[in-house]
Amino acid sequence: MSLKFIYGRSGSGKSYYCFQDIKRKIEENSDKKLILLVPEQFSFQSEKNLINYIGERAVSRAEVLSFKRMAYRVFNEVGGVTHRYMNESGKNMLLYSILNELTGELKIFNNAANKNGFVSTLSDIITEFKRYNLTPEMIKEYLEVAEEREDNILKGKLQDIYLIYSKFQDSIRKKFIDEEENLTILADKLKESKYFDGAYIWVDEFFNFTPQEYLVLEELLLKAEKVNITLCTGGLNEGERIDNLDLFLPVKNTEEKILEFVKRNNIKYEKPIKLNCDPCYRFKNSKELSHMEKNLFAFPYKIHEKYTEDICVFQALNEYSEIEYTARDIIKLVRDNGFRYKDIAVITGDLEGYQSLIKAVFTEYGIPYFIDKKVEGDNNPLVIFILSSLEVLNKNWNYESVFRYLKAGLVDIKREEIDIIENYVLANGIRGKRWIEEKDWDYKILYGFNLTEEKEEEEEEKLKKINEIRRKITEPLIEFHNNIKGEITPKKMCLELYNFLEKMNISSKIESWIKYFKERNRLDKINEYKQIWDVAIGLMEQLVEVMKEEKLNSRTLENIFKSGFEQYELGIIPPSLDQVLVSSTKRLRSHEIKALYIVGTNDGVFPSVLDENGILSDLERENLRETGLEVAKDTKSTAFEEQFLMYVTLTTMSDYLRISYPIANEEGKTLRPSIVISRLRKIFPNLCEKSNVIKEEGDIEKISSPKPTFNEFISQLRVKEEGLELSSIWLSVYDWFMNNKEWKEKFINISQGFNHTNYAEIVDTRRVRKLYGSKLNMSVSRLEKFSQCPFAYFIRYGMNAKERKIYKVSTPDIGTLMHDVVESFSRHIEGKNISWEEIDRELCESFVSTMVDEKIKDMKGSILNSSPRYKHMTNRIKDILSKSMEVISQQISRGDFKPSAYELAFGFNGDFPPISIELSSGEKVNLIGRIDRVDKLENEDGTFIRIIDYKSGKQDFNLSDIYYGLQIQLLVYLDALLQEIEDSAKKEVNPAGILYFNMDDPLISTKKEITKEEAEKEILKKLKLKGLVLKDANIIKAMDNLISGYSDIISVRVNKDGSPSKNSSVADLEDFQLLRDYVRKLIVELCEEMLEGNISIKPYKKNNYTPCGFCDYSAICQFDTSIKGSQYRFINDKKDDEVLQCIREEMKED
C-alpha cells in the first residue's frame, strides 16, 4: 500500500508519464492489474491515447476506468445491485408525486412545489446530499440540535428537505437504486472485492473529488499495491499553510484531503515526482504559449516583448462576424498550415447562445464539426406530441395546445389541411367545447358583421371540408381523453396512452423518419430518433413502477411527463473522426488539441458569473459546514475553481491560440471583454490583435471555402456595379468559378439579378379581364385604393390575396356596426315621426344602447358576443354613438337642411342604378356605392343637396386628395345623385356640400374650469362637419343659423358681411361643376389604366405619410427605394386655389 503524487503544471506531461509507467509495468510482465482511473467524460479519449502510445498490448493488460465503470466492475464481481436503476426522469416523477402527497405539510416549499423547474432544483439538492454522503438521518440530527440557532429559514428548508428526502429514500429502496448511491455502495463493496488487490493504479485528469469519490479512493489506497495520483500544480503543499489566493488552491485542497487518508491508514507515502516545465512538454513548439502558461496568472509576471504569432486576439463587431472570422481562420489553418480538423477545438462559456450560429456558419463554410452537448429530448416531435395530446384535454382545447399537437408532424393530416382549419379557427375564435360539439361548424367564411346573407355554394363546400378535417383531428383525441378521464391508476393511464400512440401509428412514423434521415446521412438525427421511442416507453414503465396504485388525473400525468422529459438528454455520437470539436469550457475533452479558439471571451462569460441559485444560499451552506455537515461549495469557493479551470482551458492547446470577443450582441447592447484579454496585453505588450469593427482585412482574407467566397465575390461585383474598381484577385476567383460547372451555373443565375428592378410588368389585357372579371363592376373606394398603389390593388382584388383573419375586433368591423346603428337610429325616429329637434341626450342613450345590444345579439359569431370582457368595448361604442347622435341632432337642428334619405344605395338592387362610366373603348364600368345621408333644402333659389359620410375614424377633407384620386367618393356620389334627381324630377338641383362626420366621443382638455354648456360647445366644435360647402352666404347660413365668425357646424368662417373668409373650405357652383367633370374624367383614366394591366409598384407619398406603413402586401412587393424601379409617387399638398387652377388647365387640354 503506497501513494505517490505526480505533479506538474498544465502541459508538463503528467498523462504521458502515466502511459510511460504503465508501459514499463507491461514490459516487466507483471501479473498485477494495471488500472488508469479518469473522469467519465475523458474515458474514451484516454483509451485511445493509451492504445496509441502503448499499442495493442494495452488492450489486454491495462484497463481504463471511470468511477462509474469501476462500480459496475465491482458489482459484477461481488453483487450489490439487486434492483433496477432509477434515472433522473424517474426521480423527478417520484419527487413530483411526493410533493403532491406532502401538500400542506411543507413550511417553505408548499407554494413552490408546482412552479416550473422546482422539481429539478429539488432533485439537484438531493443528488448533492447523496454525493456528499448527507443522509436524511444526519439532517434530522442537525435539526434536533439546532433549536437554539436563530436561522429559522434554514431550519424550515431543512425540515421540508428532510420530509421529502426521507420519503424519497423509503420509496426508492423498495424497487430501485438511485445511481447517485452507486459510489457509496462501491466504497462498501470494495471491502469484499478482490479485483483491485495488489493492483497498480494511476489516477489522472482530476483536480478534486466528491466525498463519495474520496471514500472509494481511500478503499483503493488500502487494497492496491500502489496508487499514483496526478495533480495539476506548480508545487505540492505537503502540510504547509495553504495560500487562499493560489491559482492551484483547489488542487492543493485535494492533496491535503488525500494525505489525511494516508496518515489515518498508515499508508506509505512515496516521494512525489515533479515534472519540470521549462518548457512544458506540450508547449515545446511555442515559446509564446509556454510564456503565457507561466505568467498569465503569476504575480509578479514577466513580459514577452516580441510580436505574437501563436496567440492572437480578435475584436468582432458582433457574434456573427466573430464566428465568421473563426470559420475563415480554421479554413486557412487546414488549407495552408497542414492542420486536420480534429486538431482544432472551438470552446465558449456560452455554448447555448453560440451553438446555432456555429452550426449555420460552419455549415456554410463546409467545416465538419461536432458539438459536444447532449440533445434535450423535450424538443423532439414525439415528446411534443405526447405532451400536447394531454394539454389539449387539460387546457380545454385552447388554440396553442391544439395546433402544437397538429404541428408536431405525427398526425395523418396534410399541412394544407392544418392551414385551412387554422385560418378558420383563428378567424372565428374557436376554442373549448366548440371543438367537440356534435353539430357541424357553420360560422361564416365571408367574415364581417353582416351575417344575414345566404351562404354561397362555394362556401358550403369549404365548410364541408373544414368539418371533415375537424373530425379527423377530434375523433382519436376524444376517444383517448374519454379513456383517461377522472382519477385512475398510472398503469391504466400509461396503457391508454400507449394504445393511443399505437392507433396513431406513431412508432412506424418514427421508423419512417429514421429511414428519411439515413437517406440524407443525418447521423445526429438518426441517433436521436432511435433513442426517443425507448425514452418515452421507459418513462411510462418507470411511472407505473414508481407510483404503483396511486391515483392520478390527466393534468398530473402531463406535469409528471413534462418533468420526466425535461431530464432526458439524448447522447449523440460524433459523425466522423476528422471534425472540429465544439464544446463548453466545462466539458472540454482531454485530447491532443493543437489549435484552440475561445469565442465569446466577454466579461461574465469567460470566466462565467456564478449565480447564487438553488435551494441553499452561500450563507446557509457556510452555516451547515460550521456544524460539520459537508455540502457542495459556495459561489466564492467555486470562483477559485473557475479561475483554475480558466487556466486549464487556456493551456489545453499545443500550437495555436485564438481568443475572440464581440463588442455588441445582436440587440446592439455593448459587451465588455473578459479580464483574460487585459492580462494577455500585460504579459504580451506586442500582442497580435485584429478587428473587423473598422474594416481593415484585405481581399485575400475573404477567400476561404467556395460558398462564403462566392457570396463575397457577388458582393464585390455589386461594388463594381457602383463604379468602384475591382481588385485583381477577384478576377482569379471569377476564373475558378467559371471553370467549375456547379458554380458557373449559380453565377450565371445570380448575375442576372444585377439587372433586377422592382418594376412590375404590365399584365396582359386578356389576363386582366380574367382576374377582375368580364363584368366591370366595382366600388368607388376600390378606385381610391388603385390611386394609392396599383400593385396593392392588383394583389388584393386581382390575386384575391387577403390578410389572415384573426378573431378580434377590427376597425372596419366596428365601423360597419356603427354605420348600421346610425342608419337604424335614423330610420327609427323617421318611422316614429320624431323630429331631430326633439332628440335629447337621454333619448340618444336609450335608443343607442338598445340598438347596439340587439345588433350584437344578432351577430352570430361576433367577438363582442364571445365573453363578458368585451362589455367595456361595447360600452365605449355606445358612448361614441350616443354622443355622435346627439351632435348630429344639434347640427341638423341648427340649420335648414333636413335629411331626405339614409343609406342611399347605387347598385343593381339599390335605390338607384349603378353609376355608369363609359370608357374611350365604348365599354361601360358600373360603380356601386352607398351614401350614408342625404340632406335637402328647398328655397326660392331652388333645390340644394348635400351628402354626408359617417366615419368611425378620423377623416379630414383635402381638395388635393381629390385631384390625385385619393378622395373622390363623395364627389362621385354627389355627381350621380344630382344627375339621377335631375333626370327623374326634370328639374335643376344644385350641390350644397360634400361633408364628413367623424363619429367620436372626444375628451375636452382645458386650463380652467368650464361649465357644462361650454363643454358641450367645445364637443360640437370638435365634431363639426368637414368638407366642401357651396360658396353662398344663404346656403352657409342654412347650414348654421347661428354662424358668427367661425362656425361650430361646418369648416367655414364668415366675414362681417356674411361672406365666407378666404380660408374657408368653399367652392362656387362653377367650381363644383368643374370638380364633377374632373372626377368623371379621372375615373375613366383610372379604369382604363387598371384594365390595361397597370400594376406598377408606385405608392404615393405625401409629406411623411405613405400607405406602405399600413399595407398587408409589403412582403410581396418588397418596395425599397434603393432598388431600381422602387420610387414613390410624390404628392404635394396644394392650396385649394392651386388645385382648382390645375384642374382647369387639365380640363382645357382635353
Swiss-Prot record:
<dbReference type="Pfam" id="PF21445">
    <property type="entry name" value="ADDB_N"/>
</dbReference>
<protein>
    <recommendedName>
        <fullName>ATP-dependent helicase/deoxyribonuclease subunit B</fullName>
        <ecNumber>3.1.-.-</ecNumber>
    </recommendedName>
</protein>
<comment type="function">
    <text>The heterodimer acts as both an ATP-dependent DNA helicase and an ATP-dependent, dual-direction single-stranded exonuclease. Recognizes the chi site generating a DNA molecule suitable for the initiation of homologous recombination. The AddB subunit has 5' -&gt; 3' nuclease activity but not helicase activity.</text>
</comment>
<dbReference type="GO" id="GO:0051539">
    <property type="term" value="F:4 iron, 4 sulfur cluster binding"/>
</dbReference>
<feature type="binding site">
    <location>
        <position position="1108"/>
    </location>
    <ligand>
        <name>[4Fe-4S] cluster</name>
    </ligand>
</feature>
<dbReference type="InterPro" id="IPR049035">
    <property type="entry name" value="ADDB_N"/>
</dbReference>
<keyword id="KW-0540">Nuclease</keyword>
<keyword id="KW-0227">DNA damage</keyword>
<feature type="binding site">
    <location>
        <begin position="8"/>
        <end position="15"/>
    </location>
    <ligand>
        <name>ATP</name>
    </ligand>
</feature>
<dbReference type="InterPro" id="IPR011604">
    <property type="entry name" value="PDDEXK-like_dom_sf"/>
</dbReference>
<comment type="similarity">
    <text>Belongs to the helicase family. AddB/RexB type 1 subfamily.</text>
</comment>
<dbReference type="InterPro" id="IPR014140">
    <property type="entry name" value="DNA_helicase_suAddB"/>
</dbReference>
<keyword id="KW-0378">Hydrolase</keyword>
<dbReference type="InterPro" id="IPR038726">
    <property type="entry name" value="PDDEXK_AddAB-type"/>
</dbReference>
<dbReference type="GO" id="GO:0000724">
    <property type="term" value="P:double-strand break repair via homologous recombination"/>
</dbReference>
<keyword id="KW-0234">DNA repair</keyword>
<keyword id="KW-0238">DNA-binding</keyword>
<dbReference type="GO" id="GO:0003690">
    <property type="term" value="F:double-stranded DNA binding"/>
</dbReference>
<comment type="subunit">
    <text>Heterodimer of AddA and AddB.</text>
</comment>
<dbReference type="InterPro" id="IPR011335">
    <property type="entry name" value="Restrct_endonuc-II-like"/>
</dbReference>
<keyword id="KW-0411">Iron-sulfur</keyword>
<dbReference type="GO" id="GO:0008409">
    <property type="term" value="F:5'-3' exonuclease activity"/>
</dbReference>
<keyword id="KW-0347">Helicase</keyword>
<dbReference type="Pfam" id="PF12705">
    <property type="entry name" value="PDDEXK_1"/>
</dbReference>
<dbReference type="GO" id="GO:0046872">
    <property type="term" value="F:metal ion binding"/>
</dbReference>
<keyword id="KW-0004">4Fe-4S</keyword>
<keyword id="KW-0067">ATP-binding</keyword>
<dbReference type="GO" id="GO:0005524">
    <property type="term" value="F:ATP binding"/>
</dbReference>
<keyword id="KW-0269">Exonuclease</keyword>
<feature type="binding site">
    <location>
        <position position="789"/>
    </location>
    <ligand>
        <name>[4Fe-4S] cluster</name>
    </ligand>
</feature>
<dbReference type="InterPro" id="IPR027417">
    <property type="entry name" value="P-loop_NTPase"/>
</dbReference>
<keyword id="KW-0547">Nucleotide-binding</keyword>
<feature type="binding site">
    <location>
        <position position="1117"/>
    </location>
    <ligand>
        <name>[4Fe-4S] cluster</name>
    </ligand>
</feature>
<dbReference type="Pfam" id="PF13361">
    <property type="entry name" value="UvrD_C"/>
</dbReference>
<feature type="binding site">
    <location>
        <position position="1111"/>
    </location>
    <ligand>
        <name>[4Fe-4S] cluster</name>
    </ligand>
</feature>
<dbReference type="InterPro" id="IPR014017">
    <property type="entry name" value="DNA_helicase_UvrD-like_C"/>
</dbReference>
<keyword id="KW-0408">Iron</keyword>
<dbReference type="GO" id="GO:0004386">
    <property type="term" value="F:helicase activity"/>
</dbReference>
<keyword id="KW-0479">Metal-binding</keyword>
